[in-house]
Amino acid sequence: MICPICASKSIVFQKAFRNNHPTFSNFSRFACKVCELHFANPMPEIEKLDAYNNSYHDSAHGGSERDLKQQAFFIGLAKTRLDFIAGQIGLENDHPYKILEIGPGPGAFVKVWKEKLPRSVYHVLESDKSCHKGLKEMGVKILDGKEEKLEDQYDFVILSHVLEHVTEPILFLRSFADKMKKGGHLFIEVPCMDWKHKTLDEPHLLFFDKKPMEVLLEQLKLTQLNIAYYGIPHQHLTNPLRQFFKRLRGFLWRKGIHYYHPERQKIKAIVKDDLQAQALLNFDAHKEYSSPAWWLRVISKKQ
């Protein structure tokens, strides 16, 4: 057994893998002593994993259709990601950027990007065909990575909550990094070591903190611009009192009851929408922390 990131053989057993779906049965979680990545072993059979991913939004999220409040959350979350990217490198609204997004799902980030940067040429790779109709209506080109040669010279490659589902991350990402133009950027968002605060490990196979992400970028010969913790800190996610108030705020949100929150105006300044701001209050998606939190956001550059 070797680490999927650094190829070290210095691996330590952590715990039996927690799952419900049979695709993830009889696994264990291991940790690399060198780069500190946590990962599943054995990895799922490719055929079973492909079948799961081809209906991912049904398997993991109960379908790709979203009600008004769910849409507000995902659109608002996408706006915080775009705000992070713009804050790191700057974006020109009238520039014809060429984008490749891997695993866009129903297309929340596509919608946000194209509204802000309408001259962009936007390509996607999405294995879940239930999402294709909506993506086509947004004016994107849907590529088939197995049958269609990817174009060269992308300005941005985008992966939000994709990399944690991959069995061979270096091989997977290198194929896309090679298609980036010189000076192009790779944006990644992944959960940060979410086995620490969740009751199940599935459907994630890789569990990142900053160190393994740094090693990953080195392996790809990409220059790290920023790796940052966003969302609720782990120490709050495992605090019973804070979780009680989180559930209470979630209840008020579902009932349509507004409440005071010190971050409301900061979020609204980013998302420019009352409903989206309300949807994000419980998640700190706009806020960077110095200690491990819900998500890692990563921006790197090809030199």
Model-found features: residue ranges?
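Conserved N-terminal segment of class I S-adenosyl-L-methionine
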Residues: 1-160, 170-173, 210, 229, ...
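Short, conserved loop/helix-junction motifs that constitute active-site signature segments
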Residues: 116, 178-181
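A short His-aromatic
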Residues: 161-165
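S-adenosyl-L-methionine-dependent methyltransferase catalytic module, highlighting the catalytic core
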Residues: 148, 167-178, 185-301
